[in-house]
Amino acid sequence: MPLHNLTRFPRLEFIGAPTPLEYLPRFSDYLGREIFIKRDDVTPMAMGGNKLRKLEFLAADALREGADTLITAGAIQSNHVRQTAAVAAKLGLHCVALLENPIGTTAENYLTNGNRLLLDLFNTQIEMCDALTDPNAQLEELATRVEAQGFRPYVIPVGGSNALGALGYVESALEIAQQCEGAVNISSVVVASGSAGTHAGLAVGLEHLMPESELIGVTVSRSVADQLPKVVNLQQAIAKELELTASAEILLWDDYFAPGYGVPNDEGMEAVKLLARLEGILLDPVYTGKAMAGLIGGISQKRFKDEGPILFIHTGGAPALFAYHPHV
């Protein structure tokens, strides 16, 4: 078993049972292709989402180090920050979040609703900054201040996307392979590619478990030129942690993130509405809507390697729908 080293890393069991892997019959009929969906939007805590897989490893490491405070950063409507705050609440830890307003909006829904509303419910200490220009350095500076106040902070990077956190999606690849075995031969997998941990973890896991399946990352914030080194560097860091090789080519499409991170676009919003109306499943305007737009466009433009079944990784994000009203 090529991924046996995963068991060496401490991990908290937040998720428990595997998340569903479902066939989408009406959406498949609409697109003329078999489409499956991995429902990481329904992980158990705080309205679900993919970051919980990373936090199983990161929070375990925080407890191992004796931390009493989790510190992380993201946009005002960050799904990662929301899930980190929920984990902190569950574990009886303090949570400090460094937030930016990446789209420069004054819209009340964005500033106070959706994920931001949930941060208050989880009693998160909020620190605002003009921009996360160097988030690692900014988080370390914040940790120094928090430590000076007598706390024992543990820094979680943006998106939980370091080699340790990304192990959550190596684990997810194992789960996907087990669910597909004897049921469906997935030809292509599509995932939103942002802070890169989910994409890189899947890349390492699927290379060893489902090597015939191509993995497409649809970028949500950067061009291929900017995103590729982030994913590749993390892919190699994960492989080093697991003491295995990672040589799979990283495939990225950057046609769907414009005009920028956190700003809805027409293709993404069309995808959100389409899946809601055909399958009753909620995507979001920031990540999964744009990734699904990539899947839809990839089929119409014949960009996939063949016409076999496609698996979409639903990473969550539905709370942002309320923050982006009236765009939705």
From Swiss-Prot:
<dbReference type="InterPro" id="IPR027278">
    <property type="entry name" value="ACCD_DCysDesulf"/>
</dbReference>
<dbReference type="InterPro" id="IPR005966">
    <property type="entry name" value="D-Cys_desShydrase"/>
</dbReference>
<dbReference type="GO" id="GO:0019148">
    <property type="term" value="F:D-cysteine desulfhydrase activity"/>
</dbReference>
<keyword id="KW-0456">Lyase</keyword>
<comment type="function">
    <text>Catalyzes the alpha,beta-elimination reaction of D-cysteine and of several D-cysteine derivatives. It could be a defense mechanism against D-cysteine.</text>
</comment>
<comment type="subunit">
    <text>Homodimer.</text>
</comment>
<dbReference type="GO" id="GO:0046416">
    <property type="term" value="P:D-amino acid metabolic process"/>
</dbReference>
<dbReference type="InterPro" id="IPR023702">
    <property type="entry name" value="D_Cys_desulphydr_bac"/>
</dbReference>
<dbReference type="InterPro" id="IPR036052">
    <property type="entry name" value="TrpB-like_PALP_sf"/>
</dbReference>
<dbReference type="InterPro" id="IPR001926">
    <property type="entry name" value="TrpB-like_PALP"/>
</dbReference>
<keyword id="KW-0663">Pyridoxal phosphate</keyword>
<feature type="modified residue" description="N6-(pyridoxal phosphate)lysine">
    <location>
        <position position="51"/>
    </location>
</feature>
<protein>
    <recommendedName>
        <fullName>D-cysteine desulfhydrase</fullName>
        <ecNumber>4.4.1.15</ecNumber>
    </recommendedName>
</protein>
<dbReference type="Pfam" id="PF00291">
    <property type="entry name" value="PALP"/>
</dbReference>
<comment type="similarity">
    <text>Belongs to the ACC deaminase/D-cysteine desulfhydrase family.</text>
</comment>
